[in-house]
Amino acid sequence: SDRGPPGRWRCLRLCVPLCALAFGPVAPSAALLVLAPTGSGEVPWTTALELGAGPALATSLVLFCSHFHQVEEDAAHGKRSPVVRLGTARAAALIPWFVGLSFTLEWLPVALGHWPPTALLSGLGLPAGWALIRLMRRYHDQPQRTCISKFLALRFQAWNGLGLALGLALAPLWPLG
């Protein structure tokens, strides 16, 4: 039903942006505040955005891919998901951008010297990201085949996030840079 709050957010087309905001700067800033010394009280927005932008985009990709297999049903019921509005071909063409930008946002801090080289372990998500890109390029308009896209996106998000977290956690134990 679209009567509850999630339905209202959907009507306003705010699901993907709210997802990106929640998993982007908001969740990491909360974690950083908890880890900060007592009494600091300052929200580390820049660090939170740097830590959360790539994983937030990967998480938003899961939500985005959850619409491909139900385009006809959504359109028939007046639901205007991004995939319905763009069409499956144009929406599928965005997936390499989601994946590539996720990695760019995670690897740029390494290139700039803000993060240790071990953060490149986020590349563990690359096989799932590549499988998702290949699937959607080939079968974007075949709902029976695209129904697994959300699971591939979830696999990308999980391996990418696990690799990034492990890379950042292992850095003090394995100094490479």
What are the residue ranges of the model-derived segments?
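Intramembrane alpha-helical segments
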Residues: 1-40
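Small-residue-rich segments of transmembrane alpha-helices in multi-pass membrane proteins
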Residues: 17-32, 84-88, 151-164
